[in-house]
A protein has these predicted regions:
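N-terminal helix-turn-helix DNA-binding core of bacterial DNA-binding proteins
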Residues: 2-38
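Short, cationic-aromatic polyanion-contact patches
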Residues: 3-12, 28, 59-84
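Alpha-helical residues within the helix-turn-helix
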Residues: 34, 51-52
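Amphipathic alpha-helical dimerization/coiled-coil segments
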Residues: 77-120
């Protein structure tokens, strides 16, 4: 994952809500969707992306009152830092496990398109 993608992942509105909501207590996608107004399909997409990045994980599987098995997710992200210095972007995730993941480790430049302004 490049630093721009990593920064987008944690600053996305739905992803941020999911990470904050699951920081202390595991929650299901249904609970997250209902409590935070996240459309259920978007909630599952963000959970999948966060899980793929190692920022959230399924901590248990539970049965609903109707006997359906659901997954409960818990945030693994302890700290997230986004650095912008001298035109370079770097992102650091510190996980609950003690692992630190750096993106753009050598202050790698990110290609950003220059905005084009209409001329009059």
């Amino acid at each position: 994952m490049d630093p721009l993608e990593a920064s987008r992942l944690v600053t996305d509105e739905y992803s941020a809500k999911i990470l904050v909501a699951t920081f202390k207590k595991p929650k299901s996608a249904i609970d997250l969707s209902r409590e935070y107004g996240i459309p259920i399909a978007a909630c599952y997409r963000r959970i999948h992306a966060l899980e793929h990045a190692g920022l959230i994980r399924c901590t248990e599987r539970a049965l609903t009152q109707k006997g359906k098995r659901i997954s409960l997710y818990m945030s693994q992200l302890k700290n997230a830092y986004i650095f912008f210095e001298n035109g370079r972007l770097r992102v650091r995730f510190q996980l609950a496990t003690g692992i630190t993941r750096d993106f753009g480790g050598d202050w790698k430049a990110v290609d950003v398109l220059e905005p084009s302004f209409p001329t009059q």
